[in-house]
Amino acid sequence: NSKSQMDKDYYQLQAVLEAERRDRGHDSEKIGDLQARITSLQEEVKHLKHNLERVEGERKEAQDMLNHSEKEKNNLEIDLNYKLKSLQQRLEQEVNEHKVTKARLTDKHQSIEEAKSVAMCEMEKKLKEERDAREKAENRVVQIEKQCSMLDVDLKQSQQKLEHLIENKDRMEDEVKNLTLQLEQESNKRLLLQNELKTQAFEADNLKGLEKQMKQEINTLLEAKRLLEFELAQLTKQYRGNEGQMRELQDQLEAEQYFSTLYKTQVKELKEEIEEKNRENLKKIQELQSEKETLATQLDLAETKAESEQLARGLLEEQYFELTQESKKAASRNRQEITDKDHTLSRLEETNSMLTKDIELLRKENEELTDKMRKAEEEYKLKKEEEINILKAAFEKNINTERTLKTQAVNKLAEIMNRKDFKIDRKKANTQDLRKKKKKK
């Protein structure tokens, strides 16, 4: 029974070792696949990083162009609206002033009409120039809007590329997580193999205990054999003593037969007693012989059992030695595989940390680019506001200059007209004096 159990344990250990070899080959193949997959993922990450940098640069350029175009558009609209309002105000002011001047100078000389026509021509010329400038600005606005629409399309394409890159990054993170899960599963398998090795070591210890127990049983059987041999020797000695007594009795009986027949009755009685004793002794001898035979058979069985146990023990020792060697080899291989897997796991963890650092750097670079764009937009707004304020101040200065020049021109025109009126009045006075002198004559 113990031998069959040992054979069963031996076959189970062989099956476990074979399964462990298969798992080791499968694990090595899986590690090779994982390493190839990691290298391909690293190449893909480098390619995606390069594409992300290129798309980020294109997006930045497109965003800068779009912001610049929008700012130019807004500035042109503001300038055009401001110029249009100022021109309308100037036109209204000129019309009002013209009406006032026309009302005041209806009776004035033709020079006023000429000055008015000249002023109107100048105003019409200025209005025409303003209209041309407005049309040019509107055409420029249309072109800028077209450029803005094209830049919007480019920006949408860049955003789509960026979203695609983000999806690829998420997919790669999922793949890294799956690889981490696979590594955890490999670690669990490694722990299971270690537990199985511990179980095998425990079974080997149990086999050692069984071997000790069998040795104790063999020693007990040898002690019982020695005791039985001692009892058999004692019984043989007793049988020999009984045989000697029987011979002595027979000798006495023959001597008494020779000496006297009177003692026949006694001899018969003694003979009967002797026969009874002989029968008892024979019975005892037969019993002792049967016990001797049973003891001999038991001894033979014990010897055969001891020999078979010794052979089984030798086989078990050989199997145990082989299993121990195989277990040591498997343990060393398993340790080597565990160290290889640990190295692979550390490399994968380093790769994962490097990928995470690269993604974090890309994210930081994106945030820095966004901050730089925001700061550039704010600086551009401030610069544009300063330019607008400068242009506004220059325009107001030009308007004030034009107003002063216009006021000076009107004053000069009024002065000229007053001089002409004075000359006309003087001529009238002279003509009246001449008429009076002629009448007096």
Swiss-Prot record:
Chain ranges of the RhoBD domain: 356-422
Keywords: ATP-binding, Cell membrane, Cell projection, Coiled coil, Cytoplasm, Cytoskeleton, Golgi apparatus, Kinase, Magnesium, Membrane, Nucleotide-binding, Serine/threonine-protein kinase, Transferase
SUPFAM superfamilies cross-referenced by the UniProt entry: G protein-binding domain
Region (SHROOM3 binding) location: 114-353
Record's catalysed reaction(s): L-seryl-[protein] + ATP = O-phospho-L-seryl-[protein] + ADP + H(+); L-threonyl-[protein] + ATP = O-phospho-L-threonyl-[protein] + ADP + H(+)
Regulation of its activity: Activated by RHOA binding.
Quaternary data: Homodimer. Interacts with RHOA (activated by GTP), RHOB, RHOC, GEM, MYLC2B, RHOE, PPP1R12A, LIMK1, LIMK2, TSG101, CHORDC1, DAPK3, PFN1, PTEN and JIP3. Interacts with FHOD1 in a Src-dependent manner. Interacts with ITGB1BP1 (via N-terminus and PTB domain). Interacts with SHROOM3.
PANTHER family: MYOTONIC DYSTROPHY S/T KINASE-RELATED, RHO-ASSOCIATED PROTEIN KINASE 1
Protein name per Swiss-Prot or TrEMBL: Rho-associated protein kinase 1
Naturally occurring in which organism (per UniProt): Bos taurus (Bovine)
